């Protein structure tokens, strides 16, 4: 059995090719999903990649969440399909109501493009089960609206339920409580602002630490 991982492309998506390459790198079959698709083509998991979907008009992810393919993603996620949102994809998942909170302008209002260290705060998700608790990952961060914010009670709930998945070592964008990524209550949906798909081999990225997310979901799919 080969796991099929759907990779969504919206107008303005930049990192779909990189996400597909990461899926292939771990032995999965990437399946292209266009924003207007009305079905998910039988995939086992979905990646909503980074970029500037629909030009980030209104606000990042606000239009993409209404795309036909997202209707299918929301339904599939609520039935337990693993979904990963990276950067703009994280913003889309928050706009779609699959993850709590929102992403807003970085502190200082500057676009940040840096390799950053993350700590794995939870291994109890479909996308982080391969990691050791508190593992450190080196991955690229590239965003202008990457500051994670949520009401205090939501942040407390995320902390209390172990749903903070990644934290920044150095908080460059001002995210509340150093949060770089969070999960849904069932751990099947994960969003993070940095880019694991750009850290899949030392030749082209700062590390191969990002492969762990893709191996994790592959393990889950193959285990049935």
From Swiss-Prot:
Domain of life: Bacteria
GO MF annotations, alphabetized: ATP binding; glutaminase activity; phosphoribosylformylglycinamidine synthase activity
GO biological process entries: 'de novo' IMP biosynthetic process
Primary site of residence: cytoplasm
GO CC annotation, single: cytoplasm
Functional pathway: Purine metabolism; IMP biosynthesis via de novo pathway; 5-amino-1-(5-phospho-D-ribosyl)imidazole from N(2)-formyl-N(1)-(5-phospho-D-ribosyl)glycinamide: step 1/2
Annotated Pfam families: GATase_5 (PF13507)
Gene3D superfamilies: 3.40.50.880
SMART domains noted in UniProt: GATase_5 (SM01211)
Keyword annotations of the record: ATP-binding, Cytoplasm, Glutamine amidotransferase, Hydrolase, Ligase, Nucleotide-binding, Purine biosynthesis
Entry EC number(s): 6.3.5.3, 3.5.1.2
Residues the record marks as active site: 87, 195, 197
PROSITE patterns per UniProt: GATASE_TYPE_1
UniProt-annotated location(s): Cytoplasm
Span of domain Glutamine amidotransferase type-1: 4-224
Reactions listed under catalytic activity: N(2)-formyl-N(1)-(5-phospho-beta-D-ribosyl)glycinamide + L-glutamine + ATP + H2O = 2-formamido-N(1)-(5-O-phospho-beta-D-ribosyl)acetamidine + L-glutamate + ADP + phosphate + H(+); L-glutamine + H2O = L-glutamate + NH4(+)
Function of the protein: Part of the phosphoribosylformylglycinamidine synthase complex involved in the purines biosynthetic pathway. Catalyzes the ATP-dependent conversion of formylglycinamide ribonucleotide (FGAR) and glutamine to yield formylglycinamidine ribonucleotide (FGAM) and glutamate. The FGAM synthase complex is composed of three subunits. PurQ produces an ammonia molecule by converting glutamine to glutamate. PurL transfers the ammonia molecule to FGAR to form FGAM in an ATP-dependent manner.
Assembly information from the UniProt record: Part of the FGAM synthase complex composed of 1 PurL, 1 PurQ and 2 PurS subunits.
HAMAP family, per database record: PurQ
Protein name: Phosphoribosylformylglycinamidine synthase subunit PurQ
